[in-house]
Amino acid sequence: MLTIYNTLSKTKEVFKPLDGNKVRMYVCGMTVYDYCHLGHGRSMVAFDLVTRWLRKSGYELTYVRNITDIDDKIINRANENGETFDALTARMIDAMHEDERRLNILPPDQEPRATDHIAGMHAMIQTLIDKGYAYAPGNGDVYYRVGKFVGYGKLSRKKIEDLRIGARIEVDEAKQDPLDFVLWKGVKPGEPSWESPWGPGRPGWHIECSVMSTRCLGESFDIHGGGSDLEFPHHENEIAQSEAATGKQYANAWMHCGMIRINGEKMSKSLNNFFTIRDVLEKYHPEVVRYLLVASHYRSAINYSEDSLRDAKGALERFYHALRGLPRVAAKGGEAFVERFSVAMNDDFGTPEACAVLFDLVREINRLRDSDPEAAAGLAGRLRELGDVLGVLQLEADDFLRAGAEGKVDAAEVEGLIQARLQARADKNWAESDRIRDQLTAMGVVLEDSKGTTTWRLAD
């Protein structure tokens, strides 16, 4: 029985899809004006994990994650670069997909782009105007009337009165209330625009997600996800728009993943601790980065540091050492481990406990390796099966353990030296065997002898 922490109710709830076994999930995706940073990677990996477990559990999932391809940041960056906004977004979308591929993130079933849904935005905005939830002051803009929506603040638990008192908002004469937010922005010089009933312009950010989600999944759906930084105002405003327009509950459950902290501090460009996924992958194996992102519970903040990455690398090395030398066979045995893993994942996707199960499984594989290699191989298959839920442990063990050797050592030379050492050992020429080992050690190569064979990896 799967339980999910619902930000809307602030409690864990038993998950019950709206339509039998079918699950519809929408996640706020990238605003594609720059390369993906680690925070984006955290959200992508978190909901990839949710996707994998829902499907592993037998649900028929439709996963939609949008692309915001028109926005102030996009326009500003395109102008800085001297390129069109669509040239910039096309380039950044390609880069995003490459980052996802390297992190073993499954593509969503649908990936709608805001600029493909302008007509739908016009329709929803007009509905809101007709119902009195929005107004056009005549300057080309259209605003949402926050005070009219009775449920405003139900996601974030913020009260309109408190927001007004604490608001530090520039006075906008066109707004009836400082808290009102824009649905449609009138055209400005040098900006892309689309025709609309209120004059040329472009959509506000919040209306984009309301329209794309409901167009792809229907007026009500099961799960809406995103980073915790989107809870207010973005997700709060989505609820206000969508429920005012349709008269129905928008999303049944709201899931929010935690933020990335860098050495204990918030990641930001001003603190000079801002890392793109590409920056990190230049230094660390993609699977190490992914494991760092899945080993913590999705709602927790992750502290990114050299130590945390070394810990992630060490964990994966333990897993792959257990797999090394065992044939790839179908998963067999270890039902108790599967049950514990399932209990952990069904408790709001409890990956820390699930990872602990993998470590226990590794200990059992190592215990059986010599005494019952067939059973050990079956459990190794089980380790890969459970690892696949986390998006890890699908590589050949040697490939992972030797990752990074390219450009540092000549693999053919290493293999040649290993064969020469094996021959020296067969000839009982221990001095030559030790000399070759010392030579390999000086090259940064660690040898591991087992039953007449020798494998190798690079030293940390």
Curated annotation (Swiss-Prot):
GO molecular function, one term: zinc ion binding
Catalysed reaction, written as an equation: tRNA(Cys) + L-cysteine + ATP = L-cysteinyl-tRNA(Cys) + AMP + diphosphate
Alphabetized InterPro entries for the sequence: Cys-tRNA-ligase, Cys-tRNA-synt_Ia_DALR, Cys-tRNA/MSH_ligase, CysS_C, Rossmann-like_a/b/a_fold, tRNA-synt_1_cat_dom, tRNAsynth_Ia_anticodon-bd
Motif residue range(s): 'HIGH' region: 30-40
GO cellular component annotations of the record: cytosol
Residues binding Zn(2+): 28, 209, 234, 238
Stated name of the protein: Cysteine--tRNA ligase
Gene: cysS
